[in-house]
């Protein structure tokens, strides 16, 4: 199979979905234990953190203004880089302010990426194939989440990996995936 066969917009959507889901699922599944065990969060701080996580969702409309400056596909890459960096550095900031900042960066990347991914999907896919491919993207995200949860469980249960190392590996894989897709796909 030649690389040219793999270089299409659907595969770009698939790979970006995997990268996003891997990073976000890692962040979500480790967060509650990390903030309690390492940052000594109470319910109050967890509530503030979750509220901060939703702020970029409210600001997703600003995508329109950002797209006046850069192309959508490039913005998708930038958003995934923000997500990857936010996840990668989360473990190094076990304080309220540090976690609030890393959460905002991660969440901004996540919300902007999801907004742009939906837009790109609807532009790139024909009306006949859109329902099937969008369904496959959702299924791929679910499968990626399950695989991520399994590897996190194995890495902590059998190998005693720290929260920090898991966050770093997950964020790094996201960043490598973005680099790969940026360099090899349309």
Where are these regions (language model features)?
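Helix-loop boundary and gating motifs at the non-cytosolic
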Residues: 8-53, 57
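Helix-loop junctions at membrane interfaces in 12-TM secondary transporters
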Residues: 92-102
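Transmembrane alpha-helix termini and helix-breaking/packing motifs in multi-pass membrane transporters
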Residues: 64-69, 147-162
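Intracellular juxtamembrane helix-capping segments at the cytosolic ends
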Residues: 112-125
């Amino acid at each position: 199979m030649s690389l040219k066969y793999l270089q299409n917009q659907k595969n770009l959507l698939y790979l970006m979905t995997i990268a996003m889901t891997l990073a976000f699922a890692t962040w979500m599944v480790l967060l509650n234990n990390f903030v309690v065990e390492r940052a000594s969060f109470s319910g109050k701080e967890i509530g503030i953190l979750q509220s901060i996580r939703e702020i970029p969702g409210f600001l997703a409309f600003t995508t329109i203004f950002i797209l006046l400056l850069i192309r959508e596909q490039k913005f998708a890459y930038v958003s995934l880089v923000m997500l990857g960096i936010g996840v990668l550095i989360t473990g190094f900031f076990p304080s309220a302010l540090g976690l609030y900042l890393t959460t905002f960066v991660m969440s901004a990347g996540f919300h902007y990426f999801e907004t742009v991914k939906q837009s790109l999907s609807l532009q790139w896919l024909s009306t006949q194939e859109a329902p099937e491919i969008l369904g496959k993207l959702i299924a791929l995200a679910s499968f990626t989440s399950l695989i991520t949860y399994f590897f996190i469980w194995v890495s902590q249960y059998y190998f005693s990996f720290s929260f920090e190392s898991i966050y770093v590996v997950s964020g790094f894989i996201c960043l490598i995936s973005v680099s790969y897709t940026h360099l090899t796909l349309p």
